[in-house]
């Protein structure tokens, strides 16, 4: 499971770090669709995120969207560098452009997600 990326219907990738810890970010396909990301509003450290609810807000050259979370958990790490420089989202959405790390309330279930972007 570790090292694999799973993809949600919300255009968010999920990278399991441990059974209950995952890293989340925007799929490259969605980044290409949105165009140049100009600004991001990320959740605060310690925030409780619910599946299907707002994970972050992205403003691009084309539109502004709410990105929905594919899983529920507590934010234990935030890529705050993105708030000052969105370059990693635009050029490395599936690596350096990650959004947050969540502590899940239960073990990650990859069966619900796709391995294809």
UniProtKB/Swiss-Prot annotation:
Cofactor: (R)-lipoate
InterPro entries with a match to the protein in the record: 2-oxoA_DH_lipoyl-BS, Biotin_lipoyl, GCV_H, GCV_H/Fam206, GcvH_Chlamydia, Single_hybrid_motif
Pfam families: GCV_H
GO biological process: glycine decarboxylation via glycine cleavage system
Comment on bound cofactor: Binds 1 lipoyl cofactor covalently.
Positions of the Lipoyl-binding domain: 21-103
Residues modified as N6-lipoyllysine: 62
Keyword Cell wall biogenesis/degradation applies: no
CC annotations in GO: cytosol; glycine cleavage complex
Keywords attached to this entry: Lipoyl
PANTHER family, sorted: GLYCINE CLEAVAGE SYSTEM H PROTEIN (PTHR11715), GLYCINE CLEAVAGE SYSTEM H PROTEIN-RELATED (PTHR11715:SF3)
Similarity remark: Belongs to the GcvH family.
NCBIfam families registered for this protein in UniProt: not_gcvH
Protein name: Glycine cleavage system H-like protein
Naturally occurring in which organism (per UniProt): Chlamydia muridarum (strain MoPn / Nigg)
């Amino acid at each position: 499971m570790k090292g694999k990326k799973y993809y949600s219907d919300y255009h968010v990738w999920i990278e399991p770090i441990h059974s209950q810890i995952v890293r989340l970010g925007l799929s490259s396909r969605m980044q290409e669709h949105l165009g140049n990301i100009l600004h991001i509003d990320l959740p605060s450290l310690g925030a409780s995120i619910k599946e299907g609810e707002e994970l972050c807000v992205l403003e691009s050259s084309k539109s502004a969207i709410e990105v929905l979370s594919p899983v529920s958990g507590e934010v234990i790490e935030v890529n705050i560098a993105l708030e000052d420089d969105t370059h990693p989202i635009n050029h490395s959405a599936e690596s350096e452009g990650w959004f947050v790390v969540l502590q899940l309330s239960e073990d990650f279930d990859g069966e619900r997600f796709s391995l294809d972007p």
